[in-house]
């Protein structure tokens, strides 16, 4: 599973050096090739009007990509060179798109040309996937599928030449200032589109990118959404918002009174259930933009850790598969949840606890032993801490001279839960 950082709010296209340094220093190895940065929705909105000032201030080549799509690669080439120098990969790209509330109904062919050139850029940048949003402006609802069918099939021919996969993405639409479900926000519709397109081209050329923020704005059950689309999901955009207004915040930052508005539980459960192992795109552009450049390095480290947390939660069974033998530390609620969800498939040898009253007893079918018993286990046995005092317990075990592999377990996003909690002194 690739973790991919979005450049918005972090990397300037004019002076990208510092942003690239912040990205690589925090441990990111992949960056989204966001081509909409070089041809923004705002630029497209003004296409055909006087944009001389924009040409002078934002384009080193003094041209607008919206007017000259074939110059897209020449425009991004200097940035790609710096990405390569910094050993940053670009596994996935994002094609230019229109504003959600656009007034332009005459740009379908322009968007096609931009998407075509974006696919060609993918071939030169090493990107395997490209996210291309559906056409919507100026199209009657009953014609949306037929218009987009022709749009994507035309692009599919170019994508096949370069062995690039095109990903559709779930959309919101704005009606009188309110965000509601748009094209491909219904999982059944998205499934139909992808399957039909793949059937017509005779191969798996199309897939899906799930935008978590859009699902949240549309008030959707993410687990059901994911289970409907299954393996068609090749990429997931991780971003937080309050469920009412469009924003791209770092996950877990749009919470109130310890409650997250985003359905992270449904997301992780769903992705875990389908065995997701695709592209995990972290978009926290609004969070990044609001922080001082002086704090950016620390923010980037938190962002990387957050993305790694999602990767770990989604693939939690990978951790359990790595070791033939496991011992748990903790004989409480977390241990009970482990045994309920994974005890049969990955049975531990026993569990330990610091509470001497529990030593020699049985808990969830496991013998509870004192921590000192860990000195007798084989070197290849993994110790899995099932207690929220992770780092304190890890330090305790290291101070005891235990050199075994120690990992943490979390029951925050289990397939199922107990509805009661054990209370122990």
Feature roles, as predicted:
Residues 1-27, 46, 184-324, 417-424:
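Histidine-acidic metal/acid-base catalytic patches
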Residues 1-128, 142, 153, 160, ...:
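N-terminal pre-domain/capping segments
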Residues 9, 35-39, 96-99, 134-138, ...:
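Active-site-proximal loop/turn and secondary-structure-junction residues that shape catalytic pockets
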Residues 19, 99-207, 217, 298-301, ...:
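Active-site acidic/histidine proton-transfer and metal-coordination neighborhood
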Residues 29, 89, 128, 234, ...:
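Short acidic/polar active-site loop segments enriched in Thr and Asp
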Residues 32, 92, 131, 167, ...:
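Conserved beta-strand positions in the central sheet of alpha/beta enzyme cores
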Residues 32, 167-169, 209-211, 216, ...:
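Generic enzyme active-site microenvironment
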Residues 299, 303-425:
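Hydrophobic, well-ordered beta-alpha structural blocks that scaffold small-molecule cofactor pockets
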